[in-house]
Amino acid sequence: MSELIQNVKTSFEQVLGYAPSHIIQAPGRVNLIGEHTDYNDGFVLPCAINYQTVVAAAKREDNLVRVVSVDYGNAVDEFDITQAITFQQDKMWANYIRGVVKCLLARGYAFTGADISVSGNVPQGAGLSSSAALEVVIGQTFKVLFNLEISQAEIALNGQQAENEFVGCNCGIMDQMISAEGRENHAMLLDCRSLETESVSMPEEMAVVIINSNKKRGLVDSEYNTRRQQCEEAARIFGVKALRDVTIEQFNEKVAELDEMVAKRARHVITENDRTVEAAQALRAHDMKRMGELMAESHASMRDDFEITVKEIDTLVEIVKEVIGDQGGVRMTGGGFGGCIVALVPPALVDDVKATVAAKYQAATGLKESIYVCQAKDGAGLVEML
C-alpha cells in the first residue's frame, strides 16, 4: 500500500497545488463461499484482501469537490455539491464518486467540499470489487474529513445505492459491506437479508490465493438474469419470499413438481446456504479439512446444478486441489463463466501452487493465469493524518 499512498500524495500536490491532510483506504474482497446466494436473501462468507483503493484528501471551505484519478492519467473531475450532481458519460470512473456524494447528501449528511486524489491496485475486471472499494473509500473519506455520524454499515449501503441508482449497476450488498467492515485475519459471515454480520477468525498464516483464469467472460449478464429468474420462480412455487426460506427437506418433498432446470438451480442455492453457514463454523474451528470439503462441494454444485463454471475454471480448481489436498480448499468465486478461483492455502504450499499452475494451466488451456497471493485484511479506515 505504501506505493499507492506515495502516488496519491504526489498527484494531490502536483495537480491541486498543496498537501493533503488525510490518507484513507478501502479494500477489495474475495468471497470464500456462498455463491449466487446474495440475491436469494442467503449467506455469504467473504474476506477483505490487501489490494486497496487509497485516497489522499483535504476538506474545502466552499462547496466544490475536486477529484484527481491517478489511474486515469491524473484526470480531474469537479462538481458543486449545491448544484445537481449529474452522470458523466465520458468519465465513467467519476460516476462512482459523484454517486456516493449525491447519496450521502440525500441521506441528510451535511458537509462542504473536498479535494481528493485516488488510486487503487484492486485488479479491475477480476471480480474482486474494485468498484465497491472506490464507493466505500469515498464514503469513508467524507466520514473522516467531516466527522460524520455514519456507521460502517451505512457507508456500505450508501455505496450500494450509488452503484444501483446512480451508476446503474444492479449489485448486492456483500462487496460494500466487507470492504467497509472487514477485519484482519477474519472472514465475515453476512446474512444478506438482515444484513447482520459476524466476524469469523481464520488461521492466521493461511494464504488467500486468487487465480484469474483470464478467460474472457461472455454471456455473464444474460445468464445471470436467467439464473435470477429461475431462482425467483422456484421461490414462488414454494410460496416463500426467497429460496433462503426453503430447507433441503422441503425441497426434496417438492422436487418432482419443479421444472428440471429450475430444480437444479434451486438445489444449488439451498445447499450453498447450508454450506456457507457450516463453513463459518469450520473456519472458526480452524478445521481446514472440513472447510476444503465444503469448498469442493460448492464448486461441484456451481458446475453441475447452477452450471456457471467453464472448462478453464474447472481445470484450475483441479490443478490446485492436487497440490493442497485436504490442507486447504479451492473453488470458483464470483459470478461465473470465467473469472477467478479462490484457494485457502497453507503458506508452505503457496510456492508449489504457483509452480504447478504455471506448469499445467497454460498447457491445458492456452491461457496464462494471473495469481494474487493475499491475506485477510481490515476494512476501510483512516491510514494516517498528515
Swiss-Prot record:
One GO term (biological process): galactose metabolic process
Domain of life: Bacteria
Binding site residues for ATP: 69, 125-131
Record-annotated active site: 175
GO MF term list: ATP binding; galactokinase activity; magnesium ion binding
Membrane among keywords: no
Keywords from the UniProt entry: ATP-binding, Carbohydrate metabolism, Cytoplasm, Galactose metabolism, Kinase, Magnesium, Metal-binding, Nucleotide-binding, Transferase
Name of protein: Galactokinase
Gene name as annotated: galK
